[in-house]
Amino acid sequence: MLNEILASLQVLSLPTRTNFRSVTKREVALFKGPNGWGEFSPFLEYEKEEAAHWLGAGIEAAFGEIPLTNREEIEVNATLPAVDTKIDVENILSWYPGAKVVKIKVGGDLELDIQRIENALAVNPNYLIRLDVNGGWTVSQATESVSRIIERIGIEKIQYIEQPVATLDELRELKLPIPVVGDEVIRKAEDPFAINLDGAVDILMLKVSPLGGIKRAKEIAAHHKLPVVVSSALESAVGISHGIKLAAALPELKYACGLGTGKLLANDVADLPIVDGRIKVTNVNPSGMLNYQAAPERIKWWEERIRDSFEVWQARN
């Protein structure tokens, strides 16, 4: 299988439309199997043990079983990075026609965070707001910050907060009047099945690539018996389409999904149009890849990374 992956490998450098996670170009590796295309795009700093889960998700997409679906389209949220001007906020939100929910990056300067939220609500007062902290606050900071945000915009406007603090113990200690979503606490766990989320989070974030694929993500969700939100990890349309299939395969899906992040890329290998706040479940056939090919030295770097990650993945399976 490794030889098949490397034989069809396409390493691409896709420019972003905004600075997202300090990324201005997103490098992704695509490869083809009997089912179509898979993606391997762990962020550059990830070690092979973590990257192997991403490779497993790509292998599942290209070579594994095709999951049955329970729905034909998926509601998605808008994603608002840490931008500060009203014009930027209006522009980015226009990429998500019909979205009813906005995930907003917070955790920096609190006043700027609140202004960002207020600017989003100025675009559409009916938006529900999701706060995304990426574990950047202490317990006391989270308590104070959420209190101030609620004072300014009202608790009824906030759907939930994602990973307000970093650790499981901090999540248990933290008591907030809004639902808490576990993201990093599950996808960064050495064993997502072994951790006890009781009293720590109310909702589980599922990301198909970091969790190793649809089958494993569904097993994690079934194990923890919590409501789930499916989100992306800034993949290309190939990886996001696999996340959409995860969302479509779940028995229940209460929340809009964070699967519209392809709009944060200036160029992508396929279009996943958002219509009335929804994306259709579809197979992606990437095109125009020659336009985005990475430099030869980057291709060699990704080939070696795949070899290292495949060795870890194979040992686990």
Each model region followed by its residue ranges:
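Flexible C-terminal active-site loop/helix
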Residues: 1-28, 37-42, 50, 61-64, ...
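Active-site mouth loops of central-metabolism enzymes
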Residues: 14-21, 73-87, 105-108, 135-138, ...
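A short, polar/charged loop-to-alpha-helix boundary motif
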Residues: 46-56
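Glycine-rich phosphate/pyrophosphate-binding beta-alpha loops
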Residues: 42-47, 81-83
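N-terminal small/glycine-rich loop or linker at the start of catalytic domains
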Residues: 27, 37, 66-84, 116
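Catalytic domains of carbohydrate-active enzymes, especially glycoside hydrolases
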Residues: 38-40, 91-107
